[in-house]
Amino acid sequence: MAINTDTSGKQKALTMVLNQIERSFGKGAIMRLGDATRMRVETISTGALTLDLALGGGLPKGRVIEIYGPESSGKTTVALHAIAEVQKEGGIAAFVDAEHALDPTYASALGVDIQNLLVSQPDTGESALEIVDQLVRSAAVDIVVIDSVAALVPRAEIEGDMGDAHVGLQARLMSQALRKITGNIGKSGCTVIFINQLRQKIGVTYGSPETTTGGNALKFYASVRLDIRRIQTLKKGTDEFGNRVKVKVAKNKVAPPFRIAEFDIIFGKGVSTLGCLVDLAEETGILLRKGAWYSYNGDNISQGRDNAIKYLEEKPEFAEQIKQQVREKLDKGAVVSANSVAKANEEDEEDVDLDEEE
């Protein structure tokens, strides 16, 4: 078959077909990638510098994000920090509290403007996802958090008798809703965060027996999946004051995946931003540690990590100076644990078959 080499004729035909598509489907239905300025992905900070680094800058705007892990691992805390960051920039946030467990006092302590936070506590999964879809389509809301997928109970299950079998109902509900919501998210630029719980597969011999609720659709549609785990309890003497958590970027469509970040979550206060800063400053060589002592430019500033964090709390100008130097080092390509890629496991690379739940 001969190839048409008439460049001007091809360009004229291309212009005509592009105009026809735009008339039929609306402006922006098709575009050159170089012209699509909104394709440059903007991000939302998670409140943890190490996690932002592992994500390639933060949570991407206008995408579906899944945060999953065991109970009390910090899933809701990370989502509330993202809401606080959006509100600081003047954005509007919504929280769909399907678990009926939102603590306004704790949210306020994390920096969330609870007076202007939109909150919904729907009775059924259908209601919750319809509310999410309407908020997304309005293009007036910048971030929506759903807590959690496991609590999105289908209407048939609520209205049915205890003990009735409802096989695959929630998976089908999530699959239908995500097909509808995802297209609207792309047009409105709203970020949607689904918080999810873990369950155990029965009879698994090889690989991880853990799986998330709601079927496979969310795994497929999510641009970012964060696996968050508690790895250590922080104590002062016998008193527990927080958790050390590890977050693995199990999936990332906008930056390299499989990176791992660690940070502290302090009870009643949320993510320890200065704790992240101390860790990154040590890894980049800005703060040197010899034994238990931390030093800066040859001068000892504190003994122990907790005292180093306290020192930065008392000297915000010095903390900002350290932060700027850390950013400069990272911009020049400094390699730290949060921006190096961890080895993928079998679960991360599993194929997702949506046909199973249709």
UniProtKB/Swiss-Prot annotation:
SMART domains: AAA
Cell compartments where the protein resides: Cytoplasm
One GO BP annotation of this record: DNA recombination
InterPro entries: AAA+_ATPase, DNA_recomb/repair_RecA, DNA_recomb/repair_RecA_CS, P-loop_NTPase, RecA-like_C, RecA-like_N, RecA_ATP-bd, RecA_C_sf
GO cellular component, one term: cytosol
Recorded superkingdom: Bacteria
GO MF annotation list: ATP binding; ATP hydrolysis activity; ATP-dependent DNA damage sensor activity; damaged DNA binding; single-stranded DNA binding
Family: Belongs to the RecA family.
NCBIfam families attached to this UniProt entry: tigrfam_recA
Known role: Can catalyze the hydrolysis of ATP in the presence of single-stranded DNA, the ATP-dependent uptake of single-stranded DNA by duplex DNA, and the ATP-dependent hybridization of homologous single-stranded DNAs. It interacts with LexA causing its activation and leading to its autocatalytic cleavage.
Protein name (database record): Protein RecA
